[in-house]
């Protein structure tokens, strides 16, 4: 956790966000190991959701797996699904959404080490972002990305004209 705080330059909001996520992730992992752990873990997880979603406006689900030195810049409107796996040195900015493509497909992205996401990036589906990938602001990523790549642009295209 100390590495996370250093990676966030000791800035109050990002440090609080990462620290809260780390505690919630610990609770999420340990409550599955023994049913008695729910006595202390479940109330903390409920409190985590209330504080993060209602008061701070972001949703990094406790079951998401994020590696060391997780950095957040301007962490407003961030949504990370519980099935997301991200490596070390993962950096995000405001408006980032990482998750599945819908109720019929619950698979989520696997994100490598050293990945940096710009503002308002959307990453959806069963894809892999390689190591040392940078995704530019406003990009929509629906396909896997190889290592050491720079990804920019939107994926939207017209299907039907009304």
UniProtKB/Swiss-Prot annotation:
Record InterPro entries: Colanic_acid_synth_WcaB, Hexapep, Hexapep_transf_CS, LbH_SAT, Ser_O-AcTrfase, Trimer_LpxA-like_sf
Pathway field: Slime biogenesis; slime polysaccharide biosynthesis
Enzyme class: transferase
One protein family per Pfam: Hexapep
Keyword Acetylation: no
Protein's UniProt keywords contain Isomerase: no
Protein's UniProt name: Putative colanic acid biosynthesis acetyltransferase WcaB
High-level lineage: Bacteria, Pseudomonadati, Pseudomonadota, Gammaproteobacteria, Enterobacterales
Primary gene name: wcaB
């Amino acid at each position: 956790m100390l590495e996370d705080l250093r990676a966030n330059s000791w800035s109050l909001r990002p440090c609080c966000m990462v620290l809260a996520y780390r505690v919630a992730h610990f609770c999420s992992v340990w409550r599955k190991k023994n049913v008695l752990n729910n006595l202390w873990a479940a109330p903390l997880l409920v409190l985590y959701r209330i504080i993060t979603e209602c008061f701070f406006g972001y949703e990094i689900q406790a079951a998401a797996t994020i590696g060391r030195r997780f950095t957040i810049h301007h962490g407003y409107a961030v949504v990370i699904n519980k099935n997301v796996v991200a490596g070390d040195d993962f950096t995000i900015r405001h408006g980032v959404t990482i998750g599945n493509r819908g109720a019929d497909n619950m698979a989520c992205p696997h994100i490598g080490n050293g990945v940096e996401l710009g503002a308002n990036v959307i990453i959806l589906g069963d894809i892999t972002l390689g190591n040392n990938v940078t995704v530019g602001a406003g990009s929509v990523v629906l396909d896997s990305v190889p290592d050491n790549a720079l990804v920019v642009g939107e994926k939207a295209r017209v299907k039907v004209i009304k």
